[in-house]
């Protein structure tokens, strides 16, 4: 499994097939990506300039809302993940 560094988190976005009203299945690159995902890995936290460590505010298993254009898609072991900084997370969904 990937282990994020610094203040990064790794998200797993569920891939859903989208069908138009006319029954046409849209290719994944033609669909707008959702801005919600599940946290699958969290770093140990970021280190401040004075050396103090700030623990992450999310944990593995949390469902989160994130900025639409945040992060980098990474393919690993046949799966696509999104790696982003914790500051790009907007909310945890209960």
Curated annotation (Swiss-Prot):
GO biological process: chaperone cofactor-dependent protein refolding
Intracellular or extracellular location(s): Cytoplasm
Principal location: cytoplasm
Keywords: Chaperone, Cytoplasm
Gene Ontology MF term list: ATP binding; metal ion binding; protein folding chaperone; protein-folding chaperone binding; unfolded protein binding
One cellular component (GO) term of this entry: cytoplasm
Keyword Ligase tagged: no
Subunit structure and binding partners: Heptamer of 7 subunits arranged in a ring. Interacts with the chaperonin GroEL.
Family, similarity comment: Belongs to the GroES chaperonin family.
Summary of the function given for this chain in its UniProt record: Together with the chaperonin GroEL, plays an essential role in assisting protein folding. The GroEL-GroES system forms a nano-cage that allows encapsulation of the non-native substrate proteins and provides a physical environment optimized to promote and accelerate protein folding. GroES binds to the apical surface of the GroEL ring, thereby capping the opening of the GroEL channel.
Designated name of the protein: Co-chaperonin GroES
């Amino acid at each position: 499994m990937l282990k994020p560094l610094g203040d990064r988190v790794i998200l797993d976005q569920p891939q859903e097939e989208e069908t138009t009203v006319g029954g046409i299945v849209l290719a994944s690159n033609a669909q707008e990506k959702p801005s919600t995902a599940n946290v699958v890995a969290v770093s140990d936290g970021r280190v401040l300039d004075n050396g103090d460590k700030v623990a992450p505010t999310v944990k593995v298993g949390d469902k989160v809302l994130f900025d639409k254009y945040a992060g980098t898609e990474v393919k690993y072991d046949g799966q696509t993940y999104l790696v982003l900084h914790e500051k790009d997370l907007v909310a945890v969904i209960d």
